[in-house]
Amino acid sequence: MMYEMVMTLATLAIGKIGAASDARNIRDYPLAGRELKKAAGMVQCLAEEQLPQWVSHKSSSDTLGKDLPVEASIGFCEAFQILCLAVGQQMAVATVLAKPTVPNYSLLAKLCLGISEHMELFNSTMNSKAALEKEKIDSDFFTVIAFETQFHRALSLYFSARSLWDAHDFGVAIPMMKDAIAAMETRKTSASKGIPAIKSKTSYLKFLSDDLKETRSHMESLLQSWIKENSTIYYEDVMSVVPREKILQKGLMMMKPDPYMFEAVEPLLLSTDFRKG
């Protein structure tokens, strides 16, 4: 019965993720974020409560992990909770950007760096605690994770540059934007820095190709307008390197799992004798 219970809860979590993925427009993103927080709470419950109990009651002849679905792994559930929160925060960032008012660029920089850090933490947790389960997952999925990690790190630099420019720190904003553009470039090898290449029409990243081109074009256009504006109006010395104290050292993760708890229920009778004595 333990296996059935674990897989039932895992399926509920996947259902929440499926509901979140059905978000078709910006109005649905807040709901998607809430669904992902619920999913994170469910897999957290599996990782911290239910699966450890199962492991403690298994006999020495049982093999936990080798022949089971990835959802029945403590390490995978730990990692998946991290991923759910990262994607949930993506929904929050997108919601802010869709509003007509000027956003808080400094806050967005911290949120995007928090997303990047959690994507990276998801991957490292899979490597350290769920290596067997990782082998069962399509490797292209982890290319998407690498893309998301670097893309949001580049966005963090971009929003930091916007914040510096608005604060009239023009000489630092310009090199910060240059760093953001460099971070958005396609990496030369899988071990080098940059965005993974979109190699084929079958890649999971193919749908992002046009958006990526548009983002790069926007960043370059904004940089050139800043350079022109600074050289004709502000005349501020432009630094060759962004000072360390101006670079965010740690991101912000606002998303937290919604705790999932099993309700205490009365035992159900297997049969009832209605005969009168």
Where are these regions (language model features)?
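Charged/polar, solvent-exposed surface patches and flexible loops
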Residues: 34, 41, 110, 117, ...
